[in-house]
């Protein structure tokens, strides 16, 4: 990038036992109604390295980093470059905050924890039902320590390992074994469900309800669905489930 080209803007703020790193990517208009400025992963890593060298000494070694990118669109190589730049300064990228589904998928696929929030939208008629964001689909196993937070439905094609967690405002579908924590309808949606290919967790959550799973349920090796009834959370084989059974 030449000297007169806009550069990525970084801001690092220590917050307790981690640091928050915000990234803003400027845009330029290359054609009518077509704002764009793409930074390669090498450019992002170099820019971050320069910034961190200026900020050196403001954190302890191995401090965890929460990267806030908001509406910026980043792919896996760019996220890996940011992680590499942080590692050179003894910082560890752990979380990514974004309201772009593509960035959330790239981060989750890289094994990072994800907090996907909805982008700010113009005010609408309060009588209109707010729509959930598109489902977040993660095509790999969620390893221990990984976190997924999403304002809509979450689909995991893989296992959810012990020590990992999924929190969704909508439904959760796990095409694998659930050994970690799953919380559907996190903002009080009692109509949310959790569908699991195989359950090996001790507890699950829907809305504000908590269910402890007995050993007999854990041993069942068939797809199951968890949902709320008038008696609390119920776990039923998918082949026996009827939508009318929901609270």
Swiss-Prot record:
> What highest taxon heads this organism's lineage?
Bacteria
**Which InterPro entries does this one have?**
CAP/MinC_C, MinC, MinC_C_sf, Septum_form_inhib_MinC_C
User: Which biological processes are named by the entry's GO terms?
Assistant: cell morphogenesis; cytokinesis, division site positioning; division septum assembly; regulation of cell septum assembly
Which keywords does this Swiss-Prot/TrEMBL entry list?
Answer: Cell cycle, Cell division, Septation
Keyword RNA-binding on entry: no
- Gene3D superfamilies this protein is in? 2.160.20.70
Q: What Pfam families has UniProt attached to this entry? A: MinC_C
Q: SUPFAM superfamilies from the xrefs?
A: Cell-division inhibitor MinC, C-terminal domain (SSF63848)
The record's listing under NCBIfam families reads: minC, PRK00513.2-4
What family is this?
Answer: Belongs to the MinC family.
Function per UniProt: Cell division inhibitor that blocks the formation of polar Z ring septums. Rapidly oscillates between the poles of the cell to destabilize FtsZ filaments that have formed before they mature into polar Z rings. Prevents FtsZ polymerization.
Q: How does it assemble?
A: Interacts with MinD and FtsZ.
Name-wise, this protein is Probable septum site-determining protein MinC
């Amino acid at each position: 990038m030449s000297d007169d080209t806009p550069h990525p803007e970084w801001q690092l703020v220590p917050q307790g036992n981690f640091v928050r790193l915000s990234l803003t990517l400027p845009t330029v208009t290359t054609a009518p109604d077509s704002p764009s400025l793409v930074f390669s992963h090498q450019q992002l890593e170099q820019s971050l390295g320069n910034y961190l060298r200026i900020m050196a000494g403001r954190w302890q070694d191995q401090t965890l980093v929460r990267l806030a990118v908001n509406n910026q669109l980043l792919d896996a190589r760019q996220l890996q470059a940011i992680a590499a730049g942080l590692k050179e300064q003894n910082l560890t990228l752990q979380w990514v905050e974004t309201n772009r589904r593509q960035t959330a998928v790239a981060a989750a696929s890289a094994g990072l924890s994800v907090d996907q929030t909805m982008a700010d939208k113009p005010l609408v008629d309060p009588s209109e039902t707010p729509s959930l964001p598109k489902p977040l689909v993660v095509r790999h196993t969620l390893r221990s320590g990984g976190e997924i937070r999403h304002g809509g439905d979450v689909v995991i094609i893989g296992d959810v390992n012990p020590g990992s967690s999924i929190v969704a405002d909508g439904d959760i579908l796990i095409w694998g074994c659930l050994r970690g924590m799953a919380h559907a309808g996190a903002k009080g949606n009692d109509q949310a469900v959790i569908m699991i290919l195989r359950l090996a967790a001790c507890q699950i959550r829907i809305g504000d309800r908590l269910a402890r799973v007995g050993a007999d349920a854990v041993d069942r090796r068939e797809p199951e669905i968890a949902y709320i009834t008038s008696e609390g959370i119920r776990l039923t084989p998918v082949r026996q489930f009827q939508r009318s059974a929901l609270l």
